[in-house]
Amino acid sequence: MGTARFLSAVLLLSVLLMVTFPALLSAEYHDGRVDICSLPSDSGDRLRFFEMWYFDGTTCTKFVYGGYGGNDNRFPTEKACMKRCAKA
């Protein structure tokens, strides 16, 4: 029983790393922190459908967010997205 739990934990950790690691590689870092505006669009799990905004490197673009998961490059309005991510 202990071996099965250990293998399940290793499998879960592996899946989480496979999902998270590529997004972190594509992100930019400032002062050791991830710049959320450089993260890719991530709709999360599609349990619901919310119209949200993400910064695509140039401007803010609409996308459908599933309501769970995803990353922090997600804003409720275009104005909030531009305020956080647009460079003056």
Curated annotation (Swiss-Prot):
SMART domains: KU (SM00131)
Site (Reactive bond for chymotrypsin): L47, R48
Domain BPTI/Kunitz inhibitor stretches: 37-85
Keywords: Disulfide bond, Protease inhibitor, Secreted, Serine protease inhibitor, Signal
Pfam families in the cross-refs: Kunitz_BPTI
Biological role stated in the UniProt entry: Serine protease inhibitor that inhibits trypsin (Ki=9.61 nM), kallikrein (Ki=24.8 nM), and chymotrypsin.
Miscellaneous field: Negative results: the recombinant toxin does not show activity on Kv1.1/KCNA1, Kv1.2/KCNA2, Kv1.3/KCNA3, Kv2.1/KCNB1 and Kv4.3/KCND3 channels, as well as on calcium (Cav) and sodium channels (Nav). It also does not show detectable activity on thrombin.
Protein name: Kunitz-type U15-theraphotoxin-Hs1e
Organism in which the protein naturally occurs: Cyriopagopus schmidti
